[in-house]
């Protein structure tokens, strides 16, 4: 998909005789209605001529060549106008790398870099890959979706998002079944019913500290017919994960805004058993894990809201507010 901006002068091309007759009848009726209303209101002169310009016959509407209207045209075809096939996603010349979604919960800035809190309680201490790029100046924790580059660099790209898409993605990662369909399931089903399939999601650029992403669809049975949609990264990544399609990141963005893991928290140890990781957190034994309790409350609240159990969702919300207030007072 491309955008052409510029002044375009609409020109009238003479249609078939039948179409011209029909157009003349419709234009005449509209013109008479405007004329009668203007007379009833006591308006004449320039108002009537303006009406003839817009509702008159084609020859009258375009008699003055001085009228230039700005038009924004968008188009998509098998060539997209530049000789490259629409299915060729690399026609822009940018390089992209594949990435995978990590089970991250939040991102916060510290004095010596950044800390990414994972779903299992693990804290990843990171530094910027490109120190010249300044980001996230405040130290407050932010909900984030973290992508890991699969090109061997192991760079992490955190994307700050709202709480709901972050929790929805974590639920999908953990295979938590939600009885009622989410908006991402609806988009997936609508796409399939229209005869298209999701093929790719890309993080394309960063403008004013905001990431831009595109969702690529292809016609089932005709891969040359494609559609590209502009979406928020949080929505695009959620859709891509549910459709099991690649998530790619602009290599320049990954290098400039990516983070490198410097070292894990020293007090953490891992034991692999039945393909699960158990983490001993940096806290005394037999003490409550506030992060796990907070996550359970948020998850229960969202699940209740999706299932339309609004009374239960309100109760979980109140419990979450009280829990966070208590946690804040303990700090």
Swiss-Prot record:
Q: What class of enzyme is it?
A: hydrolase
Q: Where is the UVR domain?
A: 291-326
Disulfide cysteine pairs (residue numbers): none
| Molecular functions (GO terms) | nuclease activity
Indicate the principal place this protein occupies in or around the cell. Answer: nucleus
- Please cite one Gene Ontology biological process associated with this protein: protein ubiquitination
E.C. code: 3.1.-.-
What switches on expression, per the entry, is described as: Up-regulated by abscisic acid, etephon, salicylic acid and methyl jasmonate.
BFN domain span = 126-261
Query: Which keywords has UniProt assigned to this entry?
Result: Hydrolase, Nuclease, Nucleus
* Annotated PROSITE patterns: BFN (PS51658)
Compartments where located: Nucleus
Q: Does the keyword Nuclease apply?
A: yes
Look up the domain of life of the source.
Eukaryota
Q: Which family does it belong to?
A: Belongs to the bifunctional nuclease family.
Any idea what job this protein has? Bifunctional nuclease with both RNase and DNase activities. Involved in basal defense response. Participates in abscisic acid-derived callose deposition following infection by a necrotrophic pathogen.
Q: What is this protein called?
A: Bifunctional nuclease 1
Protein source organism: Oryza sativa subsp. japonica
